[in-house]
UniProtKB/Swiss-Prot annotation:
This is Cryptide Pep-14. Expressed by the venom gland. Keywords: Secreted. It is found in: Secreted. GO terms for cellular component: extracellular region. Its main location: secreted.
Length: 16
């Protein structure tokens, strides 16, 4: 699931 890290990163204020 490629969008999941981006979503979590967005919530945390960064992107992996």
């Amino acid at each position: 699931v490629y969008w999941l890290p981006a979503v979590l990163g967005s919530l945390l204020g960064f992107t992996p």
